[in-house]
Amino acid sequence: MHVETLVIEPLTKEAFAPFGDVIETEGAELRLINNGTTERYHDLARVEAAGTEARVLVNIFRGQSFEAPIDIVMMERHPFGSQAFIPLNGRPFLVVVAEDDGGKPARLRVFLAHGNQGVNYLRNVWHHPLLALEQKSDFLIVDRAGKEDNLEEFFFSDTTYRIETTKPA
């Protein structure tokens, strides 16, 4: 099996734009509400919920922590809805995404999300399941429920993608 090393990139709105939204206050539209006592950072992610009897779910995932090296042997995507991951413990995590190439993930990229950043994967975006760093961490997840199966998985058969370090290049 061929091993390809992935290089970690900083998570920025511009770099992540083809895959979804970076959820953070930096650069967001600020609105004062509640008689000026609360700052609202407005419209941070494009939440999608399509299909029969579709609705938005809010869950908490508790992710086990990973240490390098991390082998990426599969990816997943959600054809009927977006999926957002917002860290609740202020800890970093890795975000692995890929372009679609004829129904298969291709050209993988990995980003380091700081504990004050979340991500929202758009519908049909290939991504790896949660990769918490440092220690077990909780994440608020905004997801989609509905009649249709909203999970498609792909397992690599000829290449393992490896993250050698958890620090950006």
Swiss-Prot record:
<dbReference type="InterPro" id="IPR023525">
    <property type="entry name" value="Ureidogly_lyase_bac"/>
</dbReference>
<dbReference type="InterPro" id="IPR024060">
    <property type="entry name" value="Ureidoglycolate_lyase_dom_sf"/>
</dbReference>
<dbReference type="InterPro" id="IPR011051">
    <property type="entry name" value="RmlC_Cupin_sf"/>
</dbReference>
<dbReference type="InterPro" id="IPR047233">
    <property type="entry name" value="UAH_cupin"/>
</dbReference>
<comment type="subunit">
    <text>Homodimer.</text>
</comment>
<dbReference type="Pfam" id="PF04115">
    <property type="entry name" value="Ureidogly_lyase"/>
</dbReference>
<comment type="pathway">
    <text>Nitrogen metabolism; (S)-allantoin degradation.</text>
</comment>
<dbReference type="GO" id="GO:0000256">
    <property type="term" value="P:allantoin catabolic process"/>
</dbReference>
<keyword id="KW-0456">Lyase</keyword>
<keyword id="KW-0659">Purine metabolism</keyword>
<protein>
    <recommendedName>
        <fullName>Ureidoglycolate lyase</fullName>
        <ecNumber>4.3.2.3</ecNumber>
    </recommendedName>
</protein>
<dbReference type="GO" id="GO:0050385">
    <property type="term" value="F:ureidoglycolate lyase activity"/>
</dbReference>
<comment type="function">
    <text>Catalyzes the catabolism of the allantoin degradation intermediate (S)-ureidoglycolate, generating urea and glyoxylate. Involved in the utilization of allantoin as nitrogen source.</text>
</comment>
<comment type="similarity">
    <text>Belongs to the ureidoglycolate lyase family.</text>
</comment>
<dbReference type="GO" id="GO:0004848">
    <property type="term" value="F:ureidoglycolate hydrolase activity"/>
</dbReference>
<dbReference type="InterPro" id="IPR007247">
    <property type="entry name" value="Ureidogly_lyase"/>
</dbReference>
<dbReference type="GO" id="GO:0006145">
    <property type="term" value="P:purine nucleobase catabolic process"/>
</dbReference>
